[in-house]
Design a protein with these regions (language model features):
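Amphipathic, Lys/Arg-enriched alpha-helical "gate/interface" segment within cytosolic domains
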Residues: 2-165
Length: 165
């Protein structure tokens, strides 16, 4: 079999695993999944996005990176949050801290799926502060574009394909 055929079969099997609920390492936090074979962290926060929620997820990411032994790419789906309770100063501080924390790490990608202009405002701040660092931050209005950028099959980030919509 050619490498292309094997890759297509593996991709289809991985997508089928996602749809069936297997092949996913769920975290104890709601809305978090880690796909170890793709080195991909997926977070779908719900409710009001606030400082406590972000601080908690950062700690969760650090713990997972320590366990796995290296950084991994991230996908954050902000399309289902109810509201945002954040301030510019906090977002700037978090972005600067994350930038400095990853200064001597290999590059990683962090994709944000955003559907509102209010949410986009905060992601733009985060991306601007992280620019020219190992943290490559991009904002997307389409999940397909995010999956392409992250180089993962769409089934791993599209919640409607996972039956969680």
């Amino acid at each position: 079999m050619s490498n292309l055929v094997v890759e297509i079969i593996e991709t289809n099997q991985a997508a089928a695993d996602v749809m069936s609920g297997s092949g996913i390492a769920a975290d104890s936090r709601p809305g978090v999944q880690f796909h170890e074979h793709l080195h991909l962290w997926v977070w779908r926060p719900r409710g009001i996005l606030n400082e406590a929620m972000i601080d908690d997820i950062i700690e969760c990411i650090k713990a997972k990176e320590d366990k796995v032994g290296k950084p991994f790419n991230r996908f954050t789906d902000l399309s289902v949050i109810d509201a945002i309770d954040l301030h510019f100063k906090y977002v700037f501080h978090v972005a600067l801290h994350r930038r400095l924390s990853y200064l001597h790490h290999p590059p990683l990608k962090s994709a944000f799926y955003v559907t509102s202009s209010a949410t986009a405002h905060y992601i733009k701040i985060y991306a601007l502060v992280c620019d020219h660092s190992p943290l490559r931050v991009e904002m997307f209005k389409e999940r397909t574009a995010a999956a392409t950028w992250l180089d993962v099959p769409i089934g791993f980030i599209d919640q409607s394909r996972e039956g969680n919509a």
